[in-house]
Each structure stands twice: as structure tokens, then as C-alpha cells.
């Protein structure tokens, strides 16, 4: 990359264009291109090559380079394109390789050559589809990359060629986690020479997960040979079309500049599409925008409308529609099939394949600096993030085994069943179920288990509980229908004895799917009891006895006795979870940044005393690392300490953990909750207690009022007299809050039985909490209105437990 011609100092660039090299046959001078040739010439045909004046190193498209960015270890890349840019004078686009040393051993393909770390070839590279820009000053030299056959037959690695000769036989994604099958790298180079856009697209389709590439799954099975044949067949057609259009332009003598034919308007993408998808636009070698005015544009359009686009799913869709009609039509129902659009490929922005290097703006490293300590801090924060993929789930072995055995048995026996999983938030319920599904998938791929389908429904993501019917039917048939029709179709589908694979449905956040009639949950728990359904339902909720408290007997009985409870993590388990993530660090970063065991124990005990939520413990540790990193950077600014700091390890101590905990304690929401009066805290305590008893996120205002009074009565019986001793030895909190006021309570004629149903100013208290975003209320002031928390339950619990008067209620 060169931002201006000034940045090209020490380099020369050449335009490899056959037309520019043409000379007049008579006088040897360059000829001026005719208007016809200039119009027919595409700027994309000009290739740029570079030459370094110092050592005459020449660089062109397809060369393999050794690049060193920001004082990091050199990496290998292939030059995809050298072109004149919009923001920069010259852009050098490369596709990165990942070295073997940057791949975690657990992520390598499970094949014989990668079985032991000692047998791995350190000179093996993995090609990726990740594109990036490099600067001219970052280019070190060229390297050689060979195929497996060339490397094994002709090359002996020694000190002379160890840093410049490599082997490539697989590709992978930018994270180094998904790998392609073995290929011949020389065939891949031939594909690059023919079309470098198809080269990148081929690697991308082989390494992008199927979930992000659902509409192109058929390309997964294509080999390099197939892709080469496809490119060969495409080339003549494109040239013919371009030539025909160009000839038509010449015949009209450029008199039709303001017109475009119907064919070209349909085939050529708009300018907005060209800007949004560079790879797609460059792969289509279109001729210039001038077009011949079509004499019969309408006829051409009508002809194009009759062209039938092949659809691989048409037969499957027809069968699904026929089944829908047979089920819905006899009941005189109006069938409505929703518009279903295929999932588009997500606009992923993969991180750079070089692990441990994070690029920021302008090609520089992020704000953490470029030294090893900053990279260690960055990796440590990544491993402590709650979304980090783990190779195993520590401290959940028993629960994992129970779920695994239940699902494996149901799949093998081709029967339906219900499994109820409960536990407080953050104890690993959903993660454990997903890990079980992943393990079962591996058994299926090895042929040791029957194949099955899997669907995940999250109650928080549904607009209404009935949408669950639509999700399930869409998974089965591929068509979207209305909820009412989907319920009928599902009932008929599970009643019929037709060949089908077992279907596992994970219903997360079950308490959000509860309705007044309970018909949604009844159907989902009833269908597995059908003899031919092969439906396996895993219900996940936050309360163990939710079926008994909320559901009717006919629903709770269908859940059976297959119940698995996840209890909150103890401080020892939280410490094990944090240490497990720290073990995932590289050896170099382990030595550079260390979290003291005392600090881990301090964070674990603090979280275990409140909720046992692993996510909260990881968040606190991650924030402590950020605070420690800030201290490290501030100490690094002192010039005298820079060399000493580089050679030492940095420790995350208890003080950093304490600061992170204090930040959560002293957050604006926590400070607001601490400033609330006793009556407002009593309302919040009533909400928490009611949620614990009912197992539901939403509870009626009347139930919360009753919970408040019952809890206050129990508190009064223990130590309520001591709270108001300074005012009156006979006065209790119920007299104060549910009476007609303090002055009336001090009156000798006041009867303690004459109390109100609600505490004084109750409506004002609830409105204050709603307006400040603590509670949500759908109908104000009504006893049957539903109340739910608008902030984290843990944040309220941590504040109320520090209040001496209210903590005894909880």
C-alpha cells in the first residue's frame, strides 16, 4: 500500500499492458489507441508489477511474500492484486497464510499426520480467504510454497531454506478452526492464474461454516478440478457476449449513448452493488456501459420473463405444499404461506489469521501497543470472555453425562421423550446441552449413531409463544406458515407414521413461553408421547418446580421424572472454571501476564456468595485484567522502567479484582438502588421473592403486594421491634407502613388491626421504580397488572443484601 507517490520511494511500478507496449511498425514510436480499442479496453486488464531498486526484487500478482508488520514475527501471504486505489495511490491486496505454530493443537483436523505435536511440520502453511492490505515497507522477501508431492520428493529442509520454503496442502478459516480437505496446491495456483477471484471464493466456501453458507452448500463438494473446469467453461461465454455487444456499438457509431438494452439492464449490476460487493463485481468482465438501443426492448423483456430458473428445492417445496393443503383445506382454513427468503451469507469480518496480532486503524496495532505484554493482555481478555469457545465444560461432568445418556438412548431407540433442565442463570445449562449436541453430531458423522435434526427455540426471541409453532414447522418442512396453521400441520405430522429422523428441540427460557391457556407448552410436551413422533424436547428454565407451580397436572405429568438440576457454582468450581480458561493461553503469554491464585479465589468467593454465576465471575476477572493493563501502560510511559517492564511478568492482584467489583457495586444503578427508602426496597424484595416462588419473570401486582406483607410480618416477628425502639417500643414496621401515618400510630386510640391493604404511597413508589427503569408494568395501578424486572436480578440482590434491614427478608 502506498498512500501517495512519495511513498513509492525506492520502488518502481510497471503497467503490464499489451496495448501500451504496442509500437508503430514504421517509426518504432508508440501508437495512439483508436477510439474503438479504447472503448473496448477494460481497465481491469492492466496488471501492475513492482520492483524494489535496492535489490531489484520484483513483485506481481500470485507471488508469495514474507511480510513483517509492526515488529511482529514475519508472516506469509500471496499477492492477490496490485491496483490503483481510491483512497491510496496504490493498493497491495494479499491473502494470508496461517503458520502451523499459530494453530492450536485441539483445532487441528483429527487425522494421523496431526496426531502428535512432535510430528507436525513447522513449515506447513494453511491458506485462508482473509484479504488484507500491506505496505511496501513491510515486504521482506519472496518465499517458495510447494505442494505436498513437490515438498516430499525434491526438498530437504535445512538452515539455508528453512525460512523461505514452505508446504501447503490445506486451507482454513481466519480463526484457524475450520479446515479443508487435502488438495494439490499446484492445482490451486493454476486456479489463481485463471481467476484470482474464484481462487479466493473457492477457499471461502470451503472454510465458511454451513450456517453462514446455507444457500451454497452444493459448492462444498466441488474439488479444484471441478472449479477449473467451471472457470474454463465460463470464459468463452463472457468473451462472446462482450464481443457481440462491442460490435453492435460500433455499427451504431456511438449514436445510442443514452439508451441501454433490456438484456444489459438486467444482467449488469448497479453501481451501488458494485461498491458493496467488490469480489462479485470484479469477477464479471462486463463491457463498457454504452449500449445499443434495442429495436424491440419489450419483446426481449417478455422472452426473458419466460426463462425458468432451476430450483433444487422445488420438488421438496411441492411435497410440503401438498401436505399443507391436505391438512388445512378439509378444515375450511385459509392457508397463508409467508414469504421465505433464503438466509444470506453473513457479512463476516474475520480477524486476522495471525493469532496474537490485532490490527487497528491505518494498519497499526490497537491501543494496547505492539509489545509482547500488550498481546498477552489481549489474549487473556479473549479467553476470559463469556463467548469464548471451550474444548470442555469443567465442573459439569455429571449433568453432561445425564443429558448425553438420555438423548443418546432416545435417538438409538427412535422414540420421543421430554427432558427438563433447571438452574439459576449463568450455571451452564444451555452451554452443556449444546456441547452434548456437538458430541452426538460427531458420533453421527462417524456412523456410530443414527442421524438426527436439531432446533433451538429461545423464548426471549419470540414475539409471542405461538411463534414457536412456526419455527418448528419451518424446520420440518422449510416453509413458513401462520401460527394457527402450523399447529394443525404439526399435529397431523406427528400423528402420521412416516419415515423421519429424530428431532431434538431445545426450548430455552421456558418461563417466557407460558401462556394463560398453556396450550403451547402442552402441545410441545404432548407430541413426544406420540408413538411415531420421534420428537425429543429439552425444556430449560430457571426454576426446578416450574411445572408444579405454573403448569397444570396434565402438562407436568408429561414431563415425567427426567429432570436435571444445575445448582449454582461454588467458589471452588468458579476458581476451576477461571483456571481452565487461563490454561488455554499460549506459553509465552502465560509467563507475561499472571492472575494470582489469591485474586481468583477472591473473585470466586464474592460471586459464589451472591449467585454462583460463572458469567459474572468471568466478567469481573476480565475487567480486573483491563484495570491491570491500564496500570501496566501507565508504568510503561516512564522511560526508565521500559526495559525492565519488558523482561518481567505482570501480576493481576486482589486490588485489581477489588476495583472491578467496586465498579459493579458503585455503578449508577447500584447507587440509585442504595439511595431508595425502605418502602421502595421492600417492593423490590417482594418482586424477587415472588419470582423465586413462582419461577416466572412476570408476576401480578397483587401477588407482589401479598408477598410484601407476608415477608414484613415474618420480619416483624423476629427483630422488627428493635428497628423502631427509638420512636415507640410498641410500634412495628407494619404499623408504620400499613397504618394511616406516624401521628395516627402514636395516638393511644389507634387499633393495630386497622391497617391498609397496601403500604402508604404505594402507587407513587411503583411509578418511581417504573420511571427510573427498574421495573416494567404493562397496566398501571391495577392488581392484575404484570410486573417484571428491567435490570439484572443479581444487581438488585447485591444491593439489598448490603442493607441490614432488608437483607433478612431475602
From Swiss-Prot:
Assigned keywords, A-Z: ATP-binding, DNA replication, DNA-binding, Magnesium, Metal-binding, Nucleotide-binding, Nucleus
Single GO molecular function: ATP hydrolysis activity
Entry keyword Disulfide bond: no
GO cellular component terms given for this protein: nuclear origin of replication recognition complex
Gene: ORC1
Role, per record: Component of the origin recognition complex (ORC) that binds origins of replication. It has a role in both chromosomal replication and mating type transcriptional silencing. Binds to the ARS consensus sequence (ACS) of origins of replication in an ATP-dependent manner.
Compositional bias segments (type: Polar residues): 21-30
Bias (Basic residues): 286-295
Residues holding ATP: 423-431, 509, 542, 615
The protein, known as: Origin recognition complex subunit 1
Stretches the record annotates as Disordered: 21-52, 219-317, 334-370
Primary site of residence: nucleus
Family the entry assigns: Belongs to the ORC1 family.
Assembly, per entry: ORC is composed of six subunits.
Entry's localization field: Nucleus
GO biological process: DNA replication initiation; mitotic DNA replication checkpoint signaling
Biased composition (Acidic residues): 247-280
UniProt-listed Gene3D superfamilies: 1.10.8.60, 2.30.30.490, P-loop containing nucleotide triphosphate hydrolases
Biased composition (Basic and acidic residues): 219-235
BAH domain mapped to chain residues: 57-183
Pfam families noted in UniProt: AAA, AAA_lid_10, BAH, ORC1_wHTH
Residue numbers binding Mg(2+): 508-509
Amino acid at each position: 500500500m502506498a498512500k501517495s507517490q512519495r511513498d513509492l520511494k525506492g520502488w518502481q511500478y510497471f503497467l503490464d499492458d499489451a496495448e501500451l507496449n504496442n509500437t508503430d511498425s514504421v517509426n518504432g514510436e508508440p501508437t495512439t489507441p483508436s477510439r474503438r480499442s479504447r472503448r473496448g479496453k477494460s481497465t481491469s486488464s492492466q496488471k501492475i508489477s513492482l520492483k524494489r531498486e535496492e535489490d531489484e526484487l520484483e513483485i506481481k500478482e500470485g507471488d508469495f511474500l514474507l511480510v513483517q508488520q509492526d515488529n511482529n514475527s514475519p508472516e506469509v501471504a500471496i499477492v492477490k492484486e496490485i491496483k490503483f486505489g481510491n483512497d491510496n495511490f496504490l493498493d497491495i491486496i494479499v491473502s494470508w497464510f496461517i503458520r502451523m505454530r499459530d494453530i492450536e493443537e485441539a483445532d487441528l483436523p483429527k487425522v494421523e499426520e496431526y496426531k502428535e505435536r512432535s510430528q507436525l511440520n513447522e513449515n506447513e502453511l494453511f491458506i485462508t480467504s482473509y484479504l488484507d492490505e500491506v505496505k511496501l515497507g513491510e515486504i521482506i522477501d519472496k518465499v517458495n510454497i510447494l505442494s505436498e508431492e513437490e515438498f516430499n520428493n525434491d526438498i530437504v529442509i535445512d538452515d539455508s531454506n528453512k525460512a523461505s520454503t514452505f508446504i501447503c496442502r490445506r486451507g482454513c478459516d481466519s480463526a484457524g478452526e475450520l479446515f479443508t480437505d487435502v488438495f494439490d496446491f499446484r492445482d490451486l495456483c493454476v486456479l489463481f492464474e485463471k481467476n484470482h477471484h474464484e481462487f479466493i471464493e473457492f477457499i471461502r466456501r470451503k472454510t465458511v461454516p454451513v450456517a453462514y453458507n446455507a444457500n451454497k452448500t452444493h459448492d462444498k463438494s466441488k474439488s479444484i478440478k471441478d472449479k477449473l473446469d467451471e472457470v474454463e467453461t465460463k470464459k468463452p461465454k463472457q468473451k462472446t457476449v462482450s464481443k457481440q455487444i462491442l460490435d453492435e456499438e460500433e455499427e451504431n457509431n456511438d449514436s445510442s449513448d443514452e439508451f441501454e438494452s433490456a438484456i444489459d439492464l438486467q444482467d449488469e449490476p448497479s453501481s451501488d452493488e458494485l461498491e458493496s460487493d467488490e469480489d462479485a463485481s470484479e469477477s464479471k468482465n462486463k463491457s463498457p456501459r454504452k449500449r445499443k438501443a434495442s429495436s424491440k426492448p419489450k419483446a426481449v423483456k417478455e422472452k426473458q420473463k419466460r426463462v425458468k430458473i432451476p430450483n433444487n428445492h422445488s420438488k421438496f417445496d411441492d411435497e410440503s405444499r401438498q401436505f399443507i393443503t391436505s391438512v388445512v383445506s378439509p378444515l375450511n382454513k385459509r392457508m397463508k404461506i409467508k414469504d421465505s427468503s433464503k438466509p444470506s451469507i453473513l457479512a463476516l469480518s474475520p480477524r486476522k489469521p495471525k493469532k496474537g496480532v490485532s490490527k487497528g486503524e491505518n494498519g497499526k496495532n490497537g491501543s494496547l501497543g505492539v509489545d509482547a505484554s500488550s498481546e498477552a493482555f489481549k489474549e487473556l481478555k479473549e479467553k476470559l470472555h463469556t463467548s469464548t469457545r471451550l474444548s470442555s465444560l469443567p465442573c459439569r461432568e455429571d449433568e453432561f453425562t445425564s443429558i448425553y445418556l438420555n438423548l443418546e438412548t432416545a435417538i438409538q431407540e427412535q422414540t420421543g421423550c421430554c427432558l427438563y433442565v433447571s438452574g439459576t442463570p449463568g450455571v451452564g445449562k444451555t452451554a452443556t446441552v449444546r456441547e452434548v449436541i456437538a458430541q452426538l453430531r460427531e458420533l453421527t458423522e462417524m456412523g456410530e449413531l443414527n442421524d438426527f435434526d436439531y432446533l433451538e427455540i429461545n423464548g426471549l426471541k419470540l414475539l409471542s409463544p405461538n411463534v414457536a409453532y412456526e419455527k418448528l414447522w419451518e424446520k420440518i418442512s422449510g416453509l413458513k406458515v401462520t401460527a394457527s396453521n402450523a399447529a394443525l400441520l404439526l399435529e397431523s405430522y406427528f400423528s402420521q407414521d412416516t419415515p423421519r429422523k429424530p428431532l431434538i428441540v431445545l426450548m430455552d427460557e421456558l418461563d417466557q413461553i407460558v401462556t394463560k391457556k398453556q396450550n403451547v407448552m402442552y402441545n410441545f410436551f404432548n407430541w413426544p408421547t406420540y408413538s411415531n413422533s420421534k420428537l425429543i424436547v429439552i425444556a430449560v428454565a430457571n426454576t426446578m418446580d416450574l411445572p408444579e407451580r405454573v403448569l397444570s397436572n396434565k402438562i407436568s405429568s408429561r414431563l415425567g421424572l427426567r429432570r436435571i438440576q444445575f445448582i449454582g457454582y461454588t467458589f471452588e468450581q468458579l476458581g476451576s472454571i477461571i483456571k481452565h480458561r487461563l490454561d488455554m493461553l499460549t506459553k509465552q503469554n502465560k509467563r507475561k501476564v499472571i492472575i494470582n491464585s489469591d485474586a481468583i479465589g477472591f473473585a470466586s468467593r464474592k460471586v459464589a456468595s451472591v449467585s454462583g454465576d460463572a458469567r459474572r465471575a468471568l466478567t469481573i476477572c476480565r475487567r480486573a485484567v483491563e484495570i491491570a493493563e491500564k496500570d501496566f501502560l501507565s508504568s510503561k510511559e516512564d522511560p526508565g522502567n521500559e526495559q525492565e517492564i519488558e523482561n518481567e511478568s505482570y501480576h493481576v492482584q486482589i486490588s485489581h479484582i477489588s476495583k472491578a467489583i467496586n465498579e459493579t457495586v458503585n455503578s449508577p444503578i447500584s447507587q440509585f438502588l442504595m439511595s431508595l427508602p425502605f418502602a421502595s426496597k421492600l417492593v423490590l424484595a417482594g418482586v424477587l421473592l415472588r419470582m423465586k416462588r413462582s419461577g416466572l419473570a412476570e408476576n401480578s401486582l397483587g401477588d407482589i403486594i401479598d408477598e410484601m406483607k407476608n415477608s414484613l410480618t415474618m420480619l416483624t416477628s423476629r427483630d422488627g421491634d428493635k428497628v423502631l425502639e427509638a420512636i415507640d417500643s410498641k410500634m412495628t414496621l407494619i404499623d408504620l407502613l400499613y397504618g394511616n401515618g406516624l401521628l395516627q400510630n402514636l395516638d393511644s386510640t389507634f387499633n393495630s388491626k386497622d391497617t391498609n391493604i397496601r403500604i402508604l404511597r404505594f402507587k407513587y413508589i411503583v411509578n418511581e421504580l417504573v420511571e427510573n427503569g427498574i421495573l416494567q408494568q404493562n397496566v398501571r395501578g391495577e392488581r392484575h397488572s404484570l410486573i417484571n424486572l428491567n435490570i439484572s436480578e443479581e444487581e438488585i440482590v447485591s444491593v439489598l443484601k448490603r442493607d441490614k434491614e432488608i437483607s433478612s427478608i431475602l
